[in-house]
Amino acid sequence: MHLLIAAAGSGSRMGADRNKLLLKVAGKTVLEWTLKAAFEAKTISWIGIIGQPKDKNPICSILDNSVKAVQWINGGSTRQQSVQLGLAALPNDAKSVLIHDGARCLVRSFVFDEISKIVSKGQSVIAASQVTDTIKKVDIDGEIIESPPRSDLWAAQTPQGFPVNKLKHAHSEAISKGWNVTDDASLFERLGLPVKIYDAGPSNIKVTTPFDLVIAESLLSTLKD
């Protein structure tokens, strides 16, 4: 299985002066924890890291002792553009691909493997967690419009897995129609293509804020070598 890791995030919401993936948590950088799970996943054979040129040296220094093939890919100005560039850099024989946020450093290796198994059958699937809070839809004035049933709501996560040809087609359609989305599954939704859910649990968070770092520190401390 081929894996693309989106690693172009800034540290603005974290209040950091560097890419948040280079911040330390429980003794390793955020990216190192993400890569640890990817390296341990039995199904992952090739990894591409999509990042900004300014981060290439510090990120590549982390890869010195990689146990799997890892390729650096220059990213774009948005996540969507970065994934497009990542897809263009895939080996010609890539049939399926997983897209993963580098900031989801609590992902477990078995999540990569389970999603890989589903994608290998030609299906599209995303990691997700069922919503436990009551969600409110509000109008422009902040007044509640409705409360969708929690049983219908899932918080999208990564990895997200797709057949390469279908994902490339979806991104091509996005370019031609001017679609801007925050995850790849949204493109499939717009095209009416089916995407399944894999329950990865609530711990597979994306480290975005200082509070997320506290949670990650607590959970990852139990996994230290």
Curated annotation (Swiss-Prot):
The record marks 150, 206 as: Positions MEP for the nucleophilic attack. InterPro entries: IspD, IspD/TarI, IspD/TarI_cytidylyltransf_bact, ISPD_synthase_CS, Nucleotide-diphossugar_trans. Pathway: Isoprenoid biosynthesis; isopentenyl diphosphate biosynthesis via DXP pathway; isopentenyl diphosphate from 1-deoxy-D-xylulose 5-phosphate: step 2/6. CDD domains: CDP-ME_synthetase. It catalyses: 2-C-methyl-D-erythritol 4-phosphate + CTP + H(+) = 4-CDP-2-C-methyl-D-erythritol + diphosphate. Its EC number is 2.7.7.60. GO terms for biological process: isopentenyl diphosphate biosynthetic process, methylerythritol 4-phosphate pathway. Signal peptide: none annotated. Belongs to the IspD/TarI cytidylyltransferase family. IspD subfamily. Catalyzes the formation of 4-diphosphocytidyl-2-C-methyl-D-erythritol from CTP and 2-C-methyl-D-erythritol 4-phosphate (MEP). This is 2-C-methyl-D-erythritol 4-phosphate cytidylyltransferase. It comes from Prochlorococcus marinus (strain NATL2A).
